[in-house]
Amino acid sequence: VKGLDCEEGENRFSPLNLTAATLGDRLHESDPKSKVVAVAEDPYSAVISGGSTGSAFWLDPGKGQWVSSSYYFENLPFWVKKYNEKRFASSLLDREWVPDKSFAAYKNTDTTVLNFSARPSGFKNFFRSILKIFKKEPEKYDLASLLYTPFGNMLVTDFAREAIILEELGKDDHTDLLTVCYDSPRLICEYFGPQSIEVEDMYYKLDREIGELTGFVQAQFKP
């Protein structure tokens, strides 16, 4: 197994060691024409969600692009390559993580790295200040840091919408399955702490992300 459209030796993920059948596997077993698509930032989340018979896409954090492996495809689907050309992740690097509320409105006010008085507009220059483990090229450092912000959730939502449209999910009489996993909440929680303002603010934003995605799905399949 090898990664597709990535550096040699990277993204070599597959469900070859997955011993249990997933929901998608059972769906495909009952109807081989059903499509199963898994989308996640983390390759393990994508592989486990996609199962052994579906397809899985995950984020290459160094490039900010969506990838897969030769287990699922001979070549990365054309629509994914075209999507990656938009460089959506890179376009988010100039954005600031702006809190949804004033400091007093948060419940978890005991723990935060954010100085509200010094930076009232948000987490200015945030990407340059977190995760010193990323010491390679500046852009690669920044793109990987995106996953530790609510912008990581935005990457997943945007790609999931694209997958629904271009994989033509739900467009025939065969039941399709799309699994979407947001891994940024776990990363943000691990880095800032579960009782931090950062985690609380991220969940407010994630709630909107999920609402937008479910609203998009409902709009695609109105009777």
Go through each PLM region and give its residues.
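Mobile, glycine-rich extracellular loop/lid and propeptide segments
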Residues: 181-183, 195
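Metal-dependent active-site segment of extracytoplasmic phospho-/sulfohydrolases and closely related
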Residues: 205-223
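A cross-kingdom marker for long, charged
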Residues: 162, 199-201, 215
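Active-site-proximal segments of metal-dependent phosphoesterases and phosphodiesterases across multiple
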Residues: 194-207
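His/Asp/Glu-rich, glycine-adjacent segments
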Residues: 1-174, 183-190
